Every structure is written in C-alpha cells, then in structure tokens.
A protein has these predicted regions:
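Short beta-strand segments
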Residues: 118-119
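Bacterial Sec-dependent N-terminal signal peptides
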Residues: 1-25
Length: 166
C-alpha cells in the first residue's frame, strides 16, 4: 500500500511537470545576424554597420528581457546577440541550425519564458515555420537585414507571430 502511494505521488509530480511545460507562455525572438564584414570569409565578423545594428537590438528588444540566448556557431550570429546577452549577464548557447526541432524541443521544455535566437537568412525563416508548423516564410535575400520575428507560444502552440523591422 505504501508503495502504491509513492507511485501515485510520483505520477502526480510527473503529470504536473508536463502540464506546466505546455501551459507556459513563451516568447521566442528570432533575428538574422547583422551585416557581415567580409563576404569571402566562411566565418566573417560583423561590419561596423552590423555592430551598430547589434547594439540597436538591445534598445529595440529591451522590453522583452530574454532569459536565454541561442546562436549558431558563427562569429556574426554570436556577435549579433552578444551586446544583449552581455547586458543581461547571460551566456550564449550554441545550436545546430540543421536541427531546428532539437532547439524547439529544448525551448519548449525549458522553464525560461523569453528567448533570443540568432541565425541566418536561410535558417531563421525556417525556424519560424517549424515553430508554427506552417510554411509561411521564405528565406531572406542575402542583403536583407533588420527583420525580427517575435513568436508567441501559448499552451504549447504558436499564438501569433509578429514581424518587426529594426
């Protein structure tokens, strides 16, 4: 009988943890990296204009106060997120852009409510599509910067996606 009681308690704890994950509201901010300095390098740094844009991101998105930062493993994506992460005293976690579902799963399981994710012209729109489970967004032109997707999750589903310039 005592064992049955412990099993019941354990089941309730697991069940309540699962419910919490799916009832949380989350805000996922998706940003393509800022302008890069040298398009001939495989891993270019940000240009002076890109560095200014990365600094502006802090002001534009300050009210969202991300609790977690994710970036692909490239200088330009990390350096786009860095001013904001530094201001919030957070580290930037690396994710594999070829595996968007792994990132989405980690976000959905996390207790964190607000995320900033930096990626590329051909990965950020795909991540927005994967989150919304719809093919709404096409890859950005290589010269297109300054677009922010704000994805709001409610009860485990996309509630809305806002697109903002910056």
């Amino acid at each position: 009988m005592k064992c049955l009681g412990l099993i019941s308690i354990a089941f309730c704890i697991v069940l309540s943890a699962s419910v919490t994950v799916f009832t949380q509201k989350k805000t996922i901010i998706l940003v393509r990296h800022a302008e890069k300095a040298d398009s001939t390098s495989a891993d270019p740094e940000l240009s002076p204009e890109g560095k200014q844009r990365a600094e502006r991101l802090v002001k534009v998105l300050g009210k969202y106060e991300p609790g977690a930062f994710y970036s692909t493993d490239f200088k330009r994506t990390r350096d786009t997120a860095r001013p904001f992460a530094d201001k919030r005293k957070k580290t930037i976690e690396t994710y594999d852009a070829r595996k968007p579902n792994e990132l989405i799963e980690a976000i959905m399981k996390s207790k964190t409510k607000r995320f900033l994710i930096t990626g590329h012209s051909n990965t950020i729109p795909g991540l927005a599509n994967a989150l919304g489970k719809k093919d709404l967004f096409k890859n950005l032109d290589d010269s297109e910067y300054g677009v922010i997707w704000i994805v709001r999750i409610k009860n485990g589903q996309v509630d809305r996606i806002e697109i903002l310039p910056f």
